Regions:
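C-terminal helical subdomain
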Residues: 221, 236-270
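Substrate-binding pocket helix/loop in short-chain dehydrogenase/reductase
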Residues: 132-133, 137-142
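Active-site helix of classical SDR
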Residues: 156, 196
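Residue(s) in the substrate-gating loop at a strand-loop-helix junction
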Residues: 180
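Active-site loop-to-helix junction immediately N-terminal to the catalytic Tyr of the SDR YXXXK motif
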Residues: 186-194, 206, 235
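Canonical Rossmann dinucleotide-binding motif of NAD(H)/NADP(H)-dependent dehydrogenases/reductases
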Residues: 29-69
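Conserved NAD(P)H cofactor-binding loop of Rossmann-fold oxidoreductase domains
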Residues: 124-130
Length: 306
């Protein structure tokens, strides 16, 4: 009994230290954020999938707080008019199926976008099926990988190649990629989505290390927990998208390398990885897997195969 009590006390102390450190870190982070002058009305931002969810919330914050100029690549033309009316000259919407574009630089130039003026690239567009493997078609799986993984890779690769060819252009460019906590917490019924996000996280981490001492390129990877954007409509614990978008904005302004949202999700992720397989299997079966039985945003319903 005394051993169990000691273990309990140790766990409580660890949790207190963890929560205290998160509170202090967020307090200092908030003060630093208020003093930063990174974004302004001169900042030009390229974002993918900005018509819905976190993308739309980010566009709202970037324009309302900093008066930034936004170029939004999306396929949802029905949203274009209302957004342009709301944000006037600060927003330019361009119809684009990012999964099918081979040369993003050429595409942007054809749409009268000056590549040299872009300061920030936000890879936000993503889809989720959330179906067991047996119910997934190959077309579904390929589309998920194309949109969630290959499209951000092609965009970043194209921009870096373009800037490397233009040696006279010494401006700094910041790549922000919205990944997911599910790149670290593996659940059932999401094999294609998790594969794409795991690969995307690895890609961003590899690039960050590749350009570690190159100040020309900045890489920020955002890993949020499930958010009420409609991608996981039946998920029980969804974070508020307005709050999440503010956390993402802080990470962008502070040029953070990796940001998990919420912060404390780090602790259970790494604790889970240290569990012996017999215990991790129990956690997986009774805690993680039941939460994955929800309907995601269907590719067919979103016309993402056009």
């Amino acid at each position: 009994m005394s051993v169990i009590f000691v273990i309990f006390i140790i766990i409580i102390n660890i949790l207190i230290i963890l929560l205290s450190s998160i509170f202090i870190r967020n307090y200092l982070r908030g003060k630093k954020f208020k003093n930063q002058k990174y974004l302004s009305k001169e900042t030009i931002i390229l974002i993918t999938g900005g018509c819905l969810g976190l993308g739309r919330e980010l566009i709202h914050l970037l324009i309302s707080l900093y008066n930034c100029k936004i170029i939004n690549l999306d396929i949802r033309e029905s949203e274009f008019h209302s957004m342009e009316e709301l944000y006037n000259k600060n927003l330019k919407n361009i119809y684009c199926n990012i999964a099918k574009i081979k040369d993003i630089i050429k595409f942007l130039e054809e749409n009268d976008v000056n590549i040299n003026e872009i300061d920030l690239v936000i890879n936000n567009a993503a889809i989720a099926n959330n179906l067991p493997l047996e119910q997934l078609s190959l077309n579904n799986m390929i589309s998920t990988i194309e949109i969630n993984l290959l499209a951000p890779m092609k965009i970043i690769k194209s921009f870096i190649d373009y800037y490397n060819k233009n040696k006279n252009n010494q401006k700094q460019i910041h790549f922000v990629t919205l990944c997911s906590v599910m790149s670290h917490i593996i659940s059932a019924n999401s094999s294609d989505y998790i594969t794409s996000k795991w690969g995307l996280f690895a890609f961003m981490e590899s690039l960050r290390n590749e350009y570690l001492y190159n100040n020309k390129y900045i890489f920020t990877t955002i890993c949020p927990f499930a958010t009420n954007t409609g991608m996981f409509p039946n998920f029980i614990f969804c974070m508020d998208k307005k709050w999440v978008s503010k956390q993402i904005l802080q990470s962008i302004v502070l040029k953070e390398q990796i940001k998990f949202i919420p912060d404390f999700i780090n602790f259970p992720i790494y604790l889970y990885k240290f569990l012996p397989s017999c215990l991790s299997n129990l956690v997986q079966y009774y805690i993680i897997n039941p939460f994955s039985k929800n309907l995601g945003r269907r590719i067919e319903n979103d016309n993402l195969l056009k």
